[in-house]
Curated annotation (Swiss-Prot):
Keyword Transmembrane applies: no
Record gene name: cysS
Any matching Pfam family: CysS_C
Protein name per the record: Cysteine--tRNA ligase
Taxonomic lineage: Bacteria, Pseudomonadati, Pseudomonadota, Alphaproteobacteria, Hyphomicrobiales
Gene Ontology cellular-component annotations: cytosol
Localization terms from the record: Cytoplasm
Gene3D superfamilies the UniProt entry points to: HUPs (3.40.50.620)
Binding residues for ATP: K282
Native source species: Rhizobium etli (strain ATCC 51251 / DSM 11541 / JCM 21823 / NBRC 15573 / CFN 42)
């Protein structure tokens, strides 16, 4: 496996980069907030999936593949899902309509992230499979004075927790309710948030001590992370936008329910994603899904391979904002085209790549180090290093008949070039390009004659 580097990670909780010390090196545990399955995942959703996939790969390399548990949830109960189900399937009973939306969206999400080269997490819990665990935590919070029932809701009392706001570093009097949390008169404090709310007859619901209802957003992750990772685990990840209120409220629920000093030891957050220099939004007309990029020509007039999208993300440090642009994708594609297709075999990753990733996932330095390895004779080490980043170029299988046809056209192009028929030579090159073939012209070092090699564009 090679030398084990000291892993250093930036912790949002402490605002410091420090050495990572797992609770149990035999079972390193990481939780990352996954998708709410009401719509196809957009390019901003892709960033945490890719970032924490690289961390998952690194942890597996350092501690062993069987000694890392990565949980990434599926949020399949949410008012946005209900609204989408009613819009898209008005003729179906609500539960069937919700299932149609969530199953379709979840299937698409899995297909998208697979094309981005992401490993499957160790476990992928769904919120609807963990309702009993949520109810248990809520009962604990009511029992120890951290939650109360009002107007058909169970709410967390933010003033009952002395250090509420520690993650976001926002004083309580400055905290607003935030996304998905309504400010109502029945709350003791404006920042109190919903743990459980009653459901009407046409809304999904589960029986509870407080009546038929459904969970609030934040309690879902507290329940799922505890079930699969324990009261305290090593790393909790997600996007910068989740620090407040979602992660702040997860911490409050979990710590107050279980009497712990922390929920997770390290909190990691990736930066925002812009598209062509502007905030991505449907109103701006620049809302781009992963599916759009992979399978349509809506961005830059062409489809983009998953490995290009992934590398484009990794060319910016995960904590920095990223401007997702056609220029960036083209740059990533040019870089990939220079890299060999190879197999790692028993080779170990190069220390330069490993050290870069061990320094708070410095993928920028890791990509630069990987590019320096793309030299003749380095194929196995290059491949082992590329696997850590999940950017090993794919080897394309070509059938003999197709290869023979390409060889014939390449030979014909060489003949017309000798005759100085450059128009016809360009036509052949363009024809091959349309078939996904990239030509490379050079000279025979002994004869000085023009030679042309070809490869399938990646």
């Amino acid at each position: 496996m090679g030398r084990t580097p000291e892993l250093k990670l930036y912790n949002t909780l402490t605002r410091e980069k420090s050495a990572f010390k797992p609770i149990d090196a035999e079972n390193v545990r990481m939780y990352v907030c996954g998708p709410t399955v009401y719509d196809f995942a957009h390019i901003g959703n892709a960033r945490p999936v890719i970032v924490f996939d690289v961390l998952f790969r690194l942890l597996r390399h350092v501690y062993g593949e069987d000694h890392v548990t990565y949980a990434r949830n599926i949020t399949d109960v949410d008012d946005k899902i209900n609204a989408r189900a009613l819009r898209d399937h008005p003729g179906l009973p609500l539960n069937e309509a919700i299932r149609a939306v969530t199953e379709k969206t979840e299937t698409q999400f899995h297909a998208d992230v697979a094309e981005l080269g992401c490993l499957e997490p160790s476990v992928e819990p769904r919120a609807t499979d963990n309702i009993a665990e949520m109810i248990q935590i809520i009962e604990k919070l009511i029992g120890n004075g951290h939650a109360y029932v009002a107007a058909g809701e169970v709410l967390f009392d933010t003033k009952s927790m002395a250090d509420y706001g520690e993650l976001s570093k926002r004083p309580l009097d400055e905290q607003q309710a935030g996304a998905r949390v309504a400010v109502d008169a029945h709350k003791k404090n404006p920042g109190d948030f919903v743990l459980w709310k009653l459901s009407s007859h046409n809304e999904p619901g589960w029986e509870s001590p407080w009546g038929r209802g459904r969970p609030g957003w934040h309690i879902e992750c507290s329940a799922m992370s505890r079930r699969y990772l324990g009261d305290i685990f090593d790393i909790h990840g997600g996007g910068l936008d989740l620090i407040f209120p979602h992660h702040e409220n997860e911490i409050a629920q979990s710590r107050c329910a279980h009497g712990t000093e922390v929920m997770a030891n390290v909190w990691m957050h990736n930066g925002f994603v812009q598209v062509e220099g502007r905030k991505m939004s449907k109103s701006e007309g620049n809302f781009v899904t992963i599916h759009d990029l992979l399978h349509t020509e809506t961005f830059g007039g062409r489809k983009w391979p998953g490995e290009v999208l992934r590398l484009a993300m990794l060319m910016t440090h995960y904590r920095e904002p990223i401007d997702f642009s056609i220029k960036r994708l083209e740059e990533a594609e040019r870089l990939l085209a220079k890299w060999p297709t190879a197999e790692a075999g028993d080779a170990a990753p190069d220390e330069s790549v490993l050290n870069a990733l061990a320094d708070d996932l410095n993928t920028v330095a890791a990509v630069q180090a990987l590019h320096a390895l793309a030299q003749p004779g380095n194929d196995a080490v290059f491949a082992a290093s590329a696997v850590l980043l999940g950017v090993l170029p794919k080897k394309v299988e070509i059938d003999e008949a197709f290869a023979a046809a390409v060889d014939a056209l390449v030979a014909m192009r060489l003949e017309v070039l000798k005759a100085k028929n450059f128009v016809e030579a360009d036509r052949i090159r363009d024809e091959l390009g349309a078939k996904g073939i990239q030509l490379k012209d050079g000279k025979d070092p002994e004869t000085g004659e023009r030679v042309t090699t070809w490869e399938v564009k990646r």
